């Protein structure tokens, strides 16, 4: 089976807010879907966390290396792409685009063999996983109402992030966390994401340590990105002294960037994003390195349905990954596939067991947000 085309289409029209200093608009493209087409009619899909123009520019570089190549060798092919483009540097648009291509190739391999990607990655440790509802922080009363509604829908784990946290004063920070814990109850998992990768983030180590102690009083399961993303020494000191686990890593790409964080003990929980880290192949390598060093991996996933499906397959194949991020209220997750995502009675999400990623894109729904004919070809 040979690769005949690689296409891309950005999602627009329902882009959710990101909590960033320069806030997103609904027509901004931050998620781009990639499709790899083959001479046997199979099409694999992947998701990339960047703009359509950057993905298409990167594919112009990568396409000559892909056309005519074996479509059933994802890891070898992706590593060849990384090595051939080494002179452009690690990370950036090339790595982001390779992320989508790599996952699309895994999807193809699964379709061709009739197996879910998780089994091809080494075997399924679980057939369902706990998703945590991920949402932006708000003023305490509004946040309480939002979380109460999600709790009523069956969610049992929650992450609140960004918003005014760490950006106004510490009294408001505690009021926000107290309102969240009150809403979700004493037994639910509650995580806090400070959003330290924000370009305007100004807090440092001493704030992070004080805040970690406050979060411990509310039973917070982890404290995410409390520091700027390059402050590895401060992260290492914080992890040693914090009473709550420290997580981060969503802005890093390629396994080499994660190595000093994992080996140096800077994080309790590492959070690569499969849609920009280098793809499924790269995230799996990072996961096993983390496992060998006693670091848990929970993938970052401000995501699409394709990205979520990828995270689910990875969660099935990694022994320590028992949580996945689920961005609540995003049509790019809830409205792209023929089968809707549904929590079971325990608040768990079943991991698709069909071939490949185990999902089918709904052309009619997808057409609301991108040029589906460009991505998947004209419907026959």
Write out the residue ranges for each language-model feature.
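Shared catalytic-loop signature of beta/alpha-barrel
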Residues: 57, 219, 230-247, 252-348
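Conserved, mostly hydrophobic/aromatic
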Residues: 3, 41, 62, 101, ...
């Amino acid at each position: 089976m040979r690769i005949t085309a690689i296409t891309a289409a950005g999602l627009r029209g329902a882009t959710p807010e990101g909590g960033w200093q320069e806030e997103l608009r609904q027509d901004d493209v931050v998620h781009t879907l990639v499709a790899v087409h083959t001479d046997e009619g199979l099409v694999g899909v992947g998701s990339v966390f960047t703009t359509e123009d950057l993905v298409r520019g990167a594919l112009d570089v990568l396409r000559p290396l892909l056309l005519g190549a074996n479509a059933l060798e994802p890891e070898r092919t992706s590593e060849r792409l990384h090595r051939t483009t080494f002179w452009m540097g690690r990370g950036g648009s090339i790595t982001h685009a390779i992320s989508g291509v790599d996952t699309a190739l895994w999807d193809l391999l699964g379709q061709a063999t009739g197996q879910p990607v998780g089994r091809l990655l080494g075997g399924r440790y679980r057939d369902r996983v706990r998703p945590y509802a991920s949402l932006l922080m708000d003023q305490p009363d509004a946040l309480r109402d939002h979380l109460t509604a999600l709790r009523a829908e069956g969610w049992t784990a929650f992450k609140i992030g960004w918003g005014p946290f760490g950006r106004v004063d510490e009294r408001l920070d505690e009021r926000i966390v107290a309102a969240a814990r009150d809403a979700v109850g004493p037994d639910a998992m509650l995580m806090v994401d400070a959003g330290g990768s924000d370009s305007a983030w100004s807090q440092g180590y001493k704030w992070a340590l004080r805040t970690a102690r406050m979060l411990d009083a509310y039973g917070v399961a982890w404290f995410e990105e409390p520091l700027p993303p390059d402050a590895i020494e401060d992260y290492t000191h914080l992890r040693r002294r914090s009473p709550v686990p420290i997580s981060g890593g969503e802005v890093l790409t390629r396994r080499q960037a994660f190595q000093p964080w994992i080996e140096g003990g800077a994080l309790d929980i590492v959070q690569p994003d499969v849609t920009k880290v280098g793809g499924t192949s790269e995230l799996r390598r990072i996961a096993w390195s983390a496992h060998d060093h006693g670091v848990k991996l929970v993938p970052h996933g401000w995501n699409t349905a394709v990205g979520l499906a990828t995270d689910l397959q990875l969660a099935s194949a990694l022994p320590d990954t028992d949580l996945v991020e689920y961005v609540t209220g995003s049509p790019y997750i809830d409205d792209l596939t023929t089968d809707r995502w549904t929590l079971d009675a325990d608040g768990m999400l079943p991991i698709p067991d069909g071939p490949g990623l185990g999902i089918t894109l709904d052309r009619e729904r997808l057409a609301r947000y991108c040029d589906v004919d460009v991505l998947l070809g004209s419907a026959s």
